[in-house]
Amino acid sequence: MKFLFQMDDPKKININEDSTYMLIKESLNRGIDCYYNDPRWVFSEINKVNKIKSHVSRLSLKKNNQLSYQRKILKEIDLEHMNAIFIRQDPPFDLNYISNTYLLDQLKKPLILNNSKEIRNFPEKHIMMNFPELTPPTLISSNIEAIIKFIKKNKEVIIKPAYGNGGLGIQKISHNKTNLSTFLKNYIKKFSNCPVIIQRFLKNFKKGDKRIILINGDIAGAVLRVPRTNSIKANFHAGGRAVETN
């Protein structure tokens, strides 16, 4: 059994909080051969047939449980020979990210988690548009006039980039913020002039937010993320803590 983990540099992940590390560790403990690749290493080789290949490096665990791989010893493989490919790299969700999904779309045999087509077609922060009845008042836009109108109506809001992660760029702003228009222009420019997400500020945020894990539509587990004192962010990367929940 061979698993490929497409991810950021394994040597830089925090083994105490990174879920990718836990997936790799458990796979290795079960005797599965695990490999690492950077999404930039994937390529299409077309000559009568189309082969999707990548350079990969085999993963192992050191005695201190840190992940180990040899960056200088890379092996070129046909990705059809993998049993499963885990797409685990962090955003930005940009053209490099999207181009990689086009290549992975061509694979027939490996199980790809999560499906590359679905990752591309349903960016996680846009999925809420399918559930408006469960979503607080929200605006997704890069139009300054529309954003200011929304902020003035809702008084206090949370703003965040549409394609970020780990709490990056999340801020609370008020309708009476000084130089609001200039702030918004600079904020949008900082995040590649892409649309941003603005939501009405929910005052019960201290209770945390619940992440639910579904497998084929069935609930497999859940965790409550609670922000630390004096913070509005419940993201684990931003200091949020995990609390047991039903």
Task: Mark where each language-model region is.
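Extreme N-terminal starter segment of soluble prokaryotic enzymes
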Residues: 1-4
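Short acidic, glycine-rich loop/turn motifs
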Residues: 60-61, 161-163
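Short, well-ordered coil/turn residues at beta-beta hairpins
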Residues: 6, 86-89, 161
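Conserved N-proximal alpha/beta basic substrate-recognition cap immediately N-terminal to
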Residues: 11-142, 146
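N-terminal cationic-hydrophobic initiation segments that often serve targeting/anchoring roles
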Residues: 28, 105, 151, 188-189
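Phosphate-binding site of ATP-dependent enzymes
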Residues: 145, 152-155, 163-246
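A broad, low-specificity signal for short, low-complexity segments enriched in glycine/proline
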Residues: 41-51, 74-76, 118-121, 158-160, ...
